[in-house]
A protein has these predicted regions:
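A structural motif corresponding to the C-terminal lobe/cap of the Radical SAM core domain
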Residues: 1-150
Length: 151
């Protein structure tokens, strides 16, 4: 709270939160040990201070279920309507812990040595690529209906 107030007093006009999920189970499973309620409180506070606020949601974390994704959507109803939401699939990049998980699940490391349609691969351990893109579209549609998606 105090940091947001100081940021605003210093002239901060826009902030982007890497929330990733509003489902506590998912956050803890990927080492993001914070309470989604606190994230929502800070998002709402930023808006109330007049700071343009954006957050991201990531689809496709390992072990994430449909119920977890629905929980994130339901919880997003508790944040201010002026918060823009960016929805992405889970990318994997060398050096990240999720990259090591993908390798253990059979991701072919030679991907980086060949040409692909997508510069950065999506991790599809929890969902097929088509399912992931379907959920991204579903989430974007949900947020468009609330007039707060930012692509």
């Amino acid at each position: 709270r105090e940091l947001l107030i100081l940021l605003r007093q210093a002239g901060c006009q826009k902030i982007f939160y890497g929330v990733d999920s509003l489902c506590e189970k998912v956050l803890y499973s990927v080492g993001r040990k914070y309470d989604p309620s606190l994230a929502m409180e800070n998002l709402n506070l930023a808006v109330s201070l007049g700071i343009k606020t954006e957050m991201n949601i990531i689809i496709g974390f390992p072990g994430e279920t449909e119920r977890d994704r629905v929980e994130t959507l339901k919880n997003s109803g508790r944040i201010h309507k002026d918060i823009d939401v960016v929805v992405n699939g889970l990318w994997i990049l060398p050096g990240a812990e999720i990259y090591e998980m993908a390798l253990r699940d059979g991701f072919n490391e030679s991907y980086w040595l060949s040409e692909h349609e997508e510069a950065i691969p999506f991790y599809t351990g929890a969902l097929s690529k088509d399912e992931m893109h379907g959920w991204i579209r579903r989430c974007e549609s949900y947020f468009v209906l609330q007039q707060r998606v930012h692509k």
